[in-house]
Amino acid sequence: MQPKNLQSGIRDNYHRGTVGDFLKEKIKEDSHLSVVSAYFTIYAFEAIKDKLCGIDRLDFLFGEPRFIKSLDPNKTDKKAFIVDADGLTLANRLQQKAIAKECADWITAKVAIKSVKQSNFLHGKMYHIASNGVEEAIMGSSNFTVRGLGLGAHGNNIELNLEVDSNRDRQDIKTWFNEIWNDPQLVQDVKQDVLLYLAPPQNLWL
């Protein structure tokens, strides 16, 4: 068995550190985040909200167009919301409703959200952070879920992510992101759809 806490640029949510800890370490006040992920959960927001609430902005690109289900994968009815798919037990539905509202307020103020139009088209996962002229990035397999970030209390996904330690590569990654983000043939704005999903009574938080 390998020792824990190996010094490595790999973040696997196992022996080599977590993506969540990378984000908590690198995100600063007024950071500009660019993220590509197939999933977004309010519980991942809750797990690192102390950092996320201080950012300047987040550009979030869904790599899978089924974005409404991606907000909370595998939730199909009200009873499924008692315990989320990431293993985070919540006390009651009122607490879930409060998290959803806080997340919606944050999205309204600081987040732009787009989705690729074509299913099974964009597979990469990426987190780029720009803070006061300093760039940080990590890319690999981790989605923006509690388990994907390695922050689950009852087990996490083993992922394969690599910190990008070259300035040239970090700049190339951001250029690549911008090219897709600004291409209307590939992506569409879905922010209002996401906010509609999070807003009562349309959602399942009640």
Predicted region positions:
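PLD/PLD-like phosphodiesterase catalytic module centered on the HKD motif
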Residues: M1-L206
